[in-house]
């Protein structure tokens, strides 16, 4: 387990230092460089056969990781996406604009990559580590997830979706996604298909 503290300015570092038994490696950025940078740092330093990202805000339930493990073991999956729209027990209501944007991006992705996902931007994606070379990632912003997913789908052949529970935040609670993030994601989906 790798933990990346991306320049937290609360007591995250103190909590992490007091709980060193919960992870194998800790990497800390002195300043906040964004999720994409944290993901890249994690990928640069990970080992093992599989990778999954767990955001510390707990929008995604870590107990759902057991579902990912079962699918990897039973079907030798190359990658697994958690779907907030096929939820197991609960999902918090989404902003209607975010949901419409996600449906559109998912629809375009499915056409271009010949997949049948329901929720490409849940960002709860587990995959075989050999599908992604961190040195080939060019994006650090929100579109990085689309870059990772498109590269993985082009490199692998067996992808699954599992229902996940979701307790998303709204803007007042710290949600950072905005309408303008839609455009770089769409461009990455389009250009990523033909690179």
Task: Name the predicted role of every residue range.
Residues 14-17, 40, 66, 150:
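Active-site phosphate/pyrophosphate- and oxyanion-stabilizing loops and adjacent acidic/basic residues
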Residues 5-14, 58:
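A conserved acidic beta->alpha catalytic loop
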Residues 1-8, 27-29:
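Short beta-strand/loop segment that forms part of the nucleotide-sugar
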Residues 49-57:
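Short beta-strand-to-loop acidic/aromatic patch adjacent to the donor-nucleotide binding site
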Residues 115-116, 137-140, 149-167:
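Catalytic donor-sugar/metal-binding loop of nucleotide-sugar-dependent glycosyltransferases
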Residues 25, 29-45, 50, 62-142, ...:
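Acceptor/aglycone-binding surface of glycosyltransferases and processive sugar-polymer synthases
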Residues 18-23:
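Short, conserved SAM-binding/catalytic segment
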């Amino acid at each position: 387990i790798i933990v990346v503290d991306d320049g937290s300015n609360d007591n995250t570092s103190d909590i992490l230092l007091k709980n060193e038994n919960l992870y194998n490696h800790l990497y800390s950025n002195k300043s906040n460089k964004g999720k994409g940078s944290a993901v890249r740092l994690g990928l640069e330093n990970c080992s093992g056969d599989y990778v999954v990202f767990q955001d510390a805000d707990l929008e995604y339930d870590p107990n759902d990781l057991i579902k990912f493990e079962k699918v990897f073991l039973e079907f030798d999956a190359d990658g697994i996406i958690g779907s907030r729209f096929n939820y197991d027990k609960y999902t918090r209501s989404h902003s209607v604009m975010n949901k419409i944007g996600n449906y559109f991006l998912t629809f375009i992705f499915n056409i271009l990559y010949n997949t049948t996902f329901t929720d490409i931007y849940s960002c709860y994606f587990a995959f075989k580590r050999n599908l992604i070379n961190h040195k080939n990632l060019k994006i650090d912003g929100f579109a990085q997830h689309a870059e990772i997913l498109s590269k993985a789908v082009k490199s692998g052949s067996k992808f699954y979706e599992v229902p996940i529970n979701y307790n998303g935040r709204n803007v007042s609670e710290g949600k950072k996604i905005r309408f303008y993030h839609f455009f770089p994601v769409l461009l990455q989906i389009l250009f990523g298909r033909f690179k």
